Design a protein with these regions (language model features):
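Active-site HxH/HxHxD metal-binding segment of metal-dependent hydrolases
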Residues: 1-22
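Cap/insert and terminal regions of metallo-dependent hydrolase folds
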Residues: 63-156
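Short beta-alpha junction loops
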Residues: 1, 127-128, 165-166
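Charged, amphipathic alpha-helical linkers/stalks
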Residues: 146-148, 156-169
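Core dinuclear metal-dependent hydrolase active-site scaffold
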Residues: 17-87, 166-169
Length: 169
C-alpha cells in the first residue's frame, strides 16, 4: 500500500493488479499477477505469439506448486527465474547449508523447466555479490549462470544468459 500511496500522491497513474485476473493492457497484450507466499508474486505476460512467465524469486520448488501456477499459465515460451540464493544462509560455519541451498535452487529450475516446457529459460534473479566484510563468506557457494547451463544441458531448452542492454526479439 505504501508504493501505491507514493505513486498516487505524486500524480502517477496506478493500477493495482488483482491476483490471477488477466489485465488487457494493449492489443493482444495481457498481464496476470500470480501471488506466491506472503511477499512474492510472479508475472505472466501473454502477447499475440508469446507466453512469458517471470517467476523471479517465487518459491516454486514442488510439483504441486508448479501445477498450481500451470493452471493459470499453461506452457510458456520464455521462463525467467532466480538461479541462486540471495539472502543469509547461515554463519561462516554453515557451508553445507549454502551448498545445499545452491543445489536445491538448480533442482527447482529443472522442475520449472519440466513443468512449463519453455523454449528458453533466462536465469536473471540472483546476480548478488555479498561484499560486506561480515557476509562476504556467503559468496562461497552461490550459483552462477554457467551452473544453470550445466544443470539443464540434457533438457530441451535454450539457457539465455543475458547481460546489460541485451534484449529479446
Amino acid at each position: 500500500k505504501r508504493v501505491k500511496s507514493f505513486f498516487t500522491q505524486n500524480e502517477f497513474n496506478f493500477n493495482e493488479l488483482k491476483f490471477e485476473e488477466p489485465l488487457l493492457i494493449g492489443n493482444n497484450y495481457k498481464i496476470t499477477c500470480i501471488k506466491d507466499g506472503f511477499y512474492d508474486s510472479a508475472l505472466f505476460i501473454q502477447t499475440k505469439d508469446k507466453k512469458i512467465l517471470n517467476l523471479n524469486d517465487c518459491y516454486v520448488r514442488t510439483k504441486s506448486r508448479a501445477n498450481e501456477i500451470y493452471k493459470v499459465t499453461g506452457k510458456c515460451d520464455i521462463l525467467l527465474t532466480q538461479f541462486s540464493y540471495a539472502a543469509w544462509k547461515g554463519g561462516k560455519e554453515n557451508l553445507s547449508w549454502r551448498k545445499l541451498a545452491s543445489k536445491e535452487k538448480l533442482n527447482d529450475i529443472a522442475l520449472q523447466v519440466k513443468k512449463f516446457e519453455p523454449k528458453q529459460v533466462i536465469p536473471f534473479a540472483s546476480f548478488v555479490y555479498f561484499s560486506n566484510e561480515s557476509n562476504k563468506y556467503l559468496n562461497d557457494s552461490v550459483n552462477w549462470p554457467k551452473d544453470v547451463s550445466n544443470k539443464l544441458k540434457h533438457m530441451d531448452v535454450f539457457v539465455n544468459i543475458m547481460k546489460p542492454f541485451d534484449y529479446l526479439d
